[in-house]
Amino acid sequence: MEEDDDMAATMEEIVAHAKHRGFVFPGSEIYGGLANTWDYGPLGVELKNNIKRAWWKKFVQESPHNVGLDAAILMNPKTWEASGHLGNFNDPMVDCKQCKARHRADKLIEQALEEKGIEMVVDGLPLAKMEELIREYDIACPECGSRDFTNVRQFNLMFKTYQGVTESSANEIYLRPETAQGIFVNFKNVQRTMRKKLPFGIAQIGKSFRNEITPGNFTFRTREFEQMELEFFCKPGEELKWFDYWKQFCKEWLLSLGMNEEHIRLRDHTKEELSHYSNATTDIEYQFPFGWGELWGIASRTDYDLKQHMEHSGEDFHYLDQETNERYIPYCIEPSLGADRVTLAFMIDAYDEEELEDGTTRTVMHLHPALAPYKAAVLPLSKKLGDGARRIYEELAKHFMVDYDETGSIGKRYRRQDEIGTPFCITYDFESEQDGQVTVRDRDTMEQVRLPIGELKAFLDKKIAF
């Protein structure tokens, strides 16, 4: 999608703001960086952790069906043989012969067609068809403008390394490209030890690695990324009911944390897009400044994964239904959310530059209080009031992430907190010494109320709940 000036500026503003305020830094920056690697700064790690906690709260803690898991990143290579990743986990790649730039062929074509006003899903088309489209629409290299490309070929996305001291094929091992397989191989362990009856789910948050051909768009597409995945197992024949349930549940989770409904859409996969093992897949997409992009993939994976691992391992994954005495391989619904993508989406959704009545502009991040890095900032009106203000800070810090700032005018301190999304500023003034009350300022409305110091914890507890 071709960016207009406003969109490009908005993305540039987000990247600049993220670095300036300690949300995200370029990786290995003092050595010139490493392409498409990013480090979460002090505020970014708090925001991302809060998002992960919010996901775990709704998908595991409050769910009667689901339990958690933390599987190893390194797995027996037979896992990836069984799952099909070694043979089929590929992206179509094409090189520009002129400038040697490497492109993911389906995305190159889709972007070029979108600029011509044509919407087409190219993912999943045969390689020969992609070559035909490149010629038919006279597609040029975005880097140099040349139209001289290599043939489209498949490129395996797995990162390969070696375990042990010798680099031989017998010691080949892979960084996992998804967290899901660690769940599938542990299906029986979890079901037996937790005495779970169908339907039930296994949730996991963890790092995955894909040697993407064309990563980009800040933290949207990177080679190292974090996933929040649920594999929900159910009786065959009930999978589409649960598929619809999880689609709605995932959308409601985003909305409950303040995401603008106008910025998200549910897009069903076409028959051509569907993975061979799926009988239904829907993406929840977010309207980023660079176009619509996938946040969450909800897929009905049937019994493909458990069957594959049964066949390759010899382990029996049949489930015995005690009520009906039926024996079957469970079907699986997978809602898979990118932690980095959804963190970026919440940052973009929250970012605002407001024009105030006095003609000035303030930058503010309207993050849901549950997600905000700091829940409150304690601000003594004068450094002379530091002792009393610090006592409040120390008490609140036992329960929340709280900032303390005594530098600069109170107005400038308010603006600093607005820019990082702190929902409440607590000002300790000279009257506080006498009446035991403080002024609490709301980030979004900028309205102020006086509250007794002893009521601050209950006030914040109520405000950050979701």
Curated annotation (Swiss-Prot):
Catalytic activity, as annotated: tRNA(Gly) + glycine + ATP = glycyl-tRNA(Gly) + AMP + diphosphate
Binding residues annotated for ATP, in chain numbering: 210-212, 220-225, 294-295, 338-341
Major subcellular site: cytoplasm
Pfam families named among the record's database cross-references: HGTP_anticodon, tRNA-synt_2b
GO MF annotation terms: ATP binding; catalytic activity, acting on a protein; glycine-tRNA ligase activity; protein dimerization activity; transferase activity
PROSITE patterns, per database record: AA_TRNA_LIGASE_II (PS50862)
EC annotation from Swiss-Prot or TrEMBL: 6.1.1.14
Keywords: Aminoacyl-tRNA synthetase, ATP-binding, Cytoplasm, Ligase, Nucleotide-binding, Protein biosynthesis
Subcellular localization, as worded in the UniProt entry: Cytoplasm
GO biological process: glycyl-tRNA aminoacylation
Functional summary from the UniProt entry: Catalyzes the attachment of glycine to tRNA(Gly).
Self-association state and partner proteins as the record states: Homodimer.
Family listed: Belongs to the class-II aminoacyl-tRNA synthetase family.
HAMAP family linked: Gly_tRNA_synth_B
NCBIfam families named among the record's database cross-references: glyS_dimeric (TIGR00389), PRK04173.1 (NF003211)
Protein name stated in the entry: Glycine--tRNA ligase
Species of the source: Geobacillus thermodenitrificans (strain NG80-2)
